[in-house]
């Protein structure tokens, strides 16, 4: 699947994967095991694990990864594809990511654009998603 097309539970799953969580799917809700840094913490369920709407979860990722997010009224990518009236996100230029692929992303909200950018910067422009996660999306 293209990272640029990931949404809903699929995008939440991918962000959780990048964050080191081991998500699994139960009746349409992404259930994540405890964060690897805090193995004794309880699992997080569904609505609490929504990087696409919860600034308290996504904000620290945006800050840590130095993602730039803004409203784009017009943008043409390297392939000549035009985008307009979408949120746009790109990674900040740091010594940590200087030799990594440069991934920009778009989305209908700032958090969706930022999380797509984050996933693309960690996993690439194409990702594999378990069938059970795709089926629940």
Mark where each language-model region is.
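Glycine-rich anion-binding surface patch
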Residues: 1-137
